[in-house]
A protein has these predicted regions:
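Mature, structured domains of secreted/extracytosolic soluble proteins
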Residues: 1-377
Length: 377
């Protein structure tokens, strides 16, 4: 079809350019800009560089860091990829500066952070995941039926939308209120909100299990320990240039903790269902097939820690293996959306981290020592 247009139409701008012009959303844009990348494009430079008086043109992207490319007019510079060019767009649900600061003062400030700029990059990255939708433009009546890349919903009300724009690469919604993101209200909540548990958040994220613990269809009991527990187990944050990575000592310096090790740590610290820590004696199977919790009178340990003292005097050693647990509640003093969280502190460091402890063959020890004096085998 051909239409006659009797006026000059103002070209639409990218979501990124719209955000830049709206000072009320500068904090959100600062978060997003942390993940900007600039890649030289040879073809674009050759075809259009002279027209704008430059030798080199760069693509301003965010996808290398897992975020939608809200600064690019088109999802791909390849004009032959028509299906992608004709279908891919994005939607941004950006909280205003006031909304972000209100949320910060209520939750993050109480959790040990001094300002929005003091937040760890992983927290801001996941916050951005909760505020973007990649793949297509979203209209208001569709928002309640979609989920983000981590599987959680967008919890704001349409009445919170005070600003909106259709852009050349998607849609922009400006929010006057920033409610608790769904993922922050799960058993991962303490790790998102409290600085003391930040390394637990990295363990979950790098184990690729974050989406699993986002669901509210399953009820969990999760153990977390303070950052000092990870340090006892030779784990700490290492800068990767854009953010941080949970690392440990390697042959040539610090290296990222393996996904398999972190999966064992996180799964071994999680039980499906409720746990009664005040029982006189109970054993609970964790999500890690080789890890069990031994629970006794408000304290607990794991089979790995317990097995490490085989051959020693049980009367003096066993009491030292059990550690007290303390429930970590939400801001209302209750459980989290999909279960309960308990903090533990152990001289052994992080449960499930075997490095640094001597674990000889259990079969050899049992046959050579004869552990009839231990009641818990």
């Amino acid at each position: 079809y051909i239409y006659n247009v009797d006026r000059v139409l103002e070209p639409l701008e990218t979501i990124y350019d719209v955000l830049k012009k709206k000072s009320d959303y500068s904090d959100f844009l600062d978060f997003y800009s942390q993940y900007s990348t600039y890649a030289y494009d040879k073809d674009l430079s050759a075809d259009y560089g002279k027209a704008v008086g430059v030798d080199s043109l760069f693509l301003h992207a965010h996808s290398p860091n897992g975020l939608p490319n809200i600064a690019l007019e088109w999802p791909t510079p390849n004009f032959r990829l028509y299906p992608e060019l004709a279908s891919i767009s994005y939607s941004i649900f950006a909280p205003s500066n006031q909304a972000l600061n209100t949320f910060f003062n209520r939750y993050w400030k109480a959790g040990g952070y001094s300002s929005l700029t003091d937040l760890d990059p992983l927290i801001t990255k996941i916050l951005l995941y909760q505020s973007v939708y990649g793949g297509s433009i979203v209209f208001p009546d569709e928002i309640s039926g979609i989920t983000n890349s981590l599987g959680s919903h967008y919890d704001f009300q349409l009445s919170d939308v005070k600003d909106k724009s259709i852009c050349v690469n998607g849609s922009f919604y400006g929010l006057s209120n920033f409610p608790m993101p769904e993922i922050f209200s799960t058993v991962m909540g303490p790790s998102f909100l409290k600085r003391d548990y930040l390394l637990s958040l990295y363990a979950i994220f790098q184990s690729n299990q974050m989406a699993a613990y986002t669901t509210t269809a399953t009820n969990y009991t999760m153990l977390i320990t303070k950052n000092s527990g990870y340090e006892i187990s030779d784990m700490r944050l290492m800068s990767d240039g854009v953010g941080n990575t949970l690392a440990t000592s390697g042959e040539d310096g610090d290296v990222a903790v393996s996904t398999s090790d972190l999966k064992r740590i996180v799964s071994g610290g999680t039980v499906v269902g409720d746990v009664n820590f005040n029982t006189p004696w109970a054993v609970y199977a964790t999500q890690d097939g080789g890890t069990y919790w031994f629970v006794k009178d408000g304290k607990m340990t794991t089979n790995y820690v317990f097995n490490s003292v085989l051959g020693q005097d049980p009367q003096t050693v066993i009491p030292t293996l059990f550690t007290e647990v303390k429930e970590v509640t939400n801001d209302a003093g209750g459980s989290w959306a999909n279960g309960k969280v308990y903090e533990y502190e152990s001289d052994f460091g992080v449960f499930g981290k075997l490095d640094g402890l001597e674990y000889p063959s259990l079969r050899t020890m049992l046959t050579s020592i004869g552990e009839t004096k231990y009641p818990n085998f």
